[in-house]
């Protein structure tokens, strides 16, 4: 599906998955895997595995992320994170290993397609030379097939370039991703930003967690 607006909540009891090519919104998500190429918006997330290529907004009467492993590539904004019981709650922002791997694979595929296009171009030149110098040996059907194959590869290249550009922009822009916690973040929570980790030793309130080139820092929520 492209986008999904779930009026009620979702609880698959760890046996189901919600996936969308765009945004997902719902009242709550419990014990569910959620994947969205866009944003996710809900009232609370409980014991879920979440991956969004956009942002995650958890706000409302409860407004909490409790338990689970939650990734918002472009950032996470929540009222609260974790619980007084110090339940393990993992938040991740920034590009994932899978996204970087996908980008690297696209670049390799582009190089391969470029090589194939170059081969077809060389073949076209040879056919043109044969047509001019030895017309009796010119194979028009084969020349047409080569030209058509090149056109197909050019179309494939255009799609790969579009996809690789989108991923490149996502990886670049996700460097500025932050975690915003309006009320409380509890011990037991962990925030991962690339190779850096923040683990609150006590309850912190009203903070923004952001990455610098050397470390992770906390800022006031209203900054």
Kindly give the residue locations of the regions a language model identified.
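Extended repeat-based interaction scaffolds and adjacent low-complexity, acidic/S/T/P-biased segments
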Residues: 10-11
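Intrinsically disordered, low-complexity terminal regions
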Residues: 15, 19-26, 33-43, 47-223
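Short, small-residue-biased leader/transition segments that mark boundaries at the very start
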Residues: 1-3
């Amino acid at each position: 599906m492209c986008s999904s607006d779930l009026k009620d909540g979702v609880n698959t009891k760890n046996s189901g998955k919600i996936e969308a090519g765009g945004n997902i919104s719902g009242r709550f998500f419990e014990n569910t895997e959620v994947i969205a190429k866009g944003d996710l918006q809900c009232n609370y997330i409980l014991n879920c595995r979440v991956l969004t290529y956009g942002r995650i907004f958890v706000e409302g009467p409860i407004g909490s992320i409790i338990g689970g492993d939650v990734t918002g590539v472009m950032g996470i904004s929540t009222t609260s994170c974790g619980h007084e019981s110090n339940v393990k709650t993992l938040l991740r922002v920034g590009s994932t290993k899978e996204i970087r791997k996908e980008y690297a694979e696209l670049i390799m595929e582009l190089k391969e397609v470029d090589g194939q296009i170059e081969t077809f171009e060389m073949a076209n030149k040879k056919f043109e030379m044969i047509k001019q110098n030895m017309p009796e040996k010119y194979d028009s059907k084969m020349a047409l097939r080569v030209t058509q194959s090149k056109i197909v590869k050019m179309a494939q290249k255009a799609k790969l370039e579009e996809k690789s550009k989108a991923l490149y922009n996502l990886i670049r822009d996700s460097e500025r991703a932050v975690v915003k916690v309006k009320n409380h973040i509890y011990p037991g929570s962990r925030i991962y930003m690339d190779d850096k980790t923040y683990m609150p030793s006590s309850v912190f309130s009203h903070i923004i967690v952001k990455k610098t080139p050397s470390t992770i820092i906390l800022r006031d929520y209203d900054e």
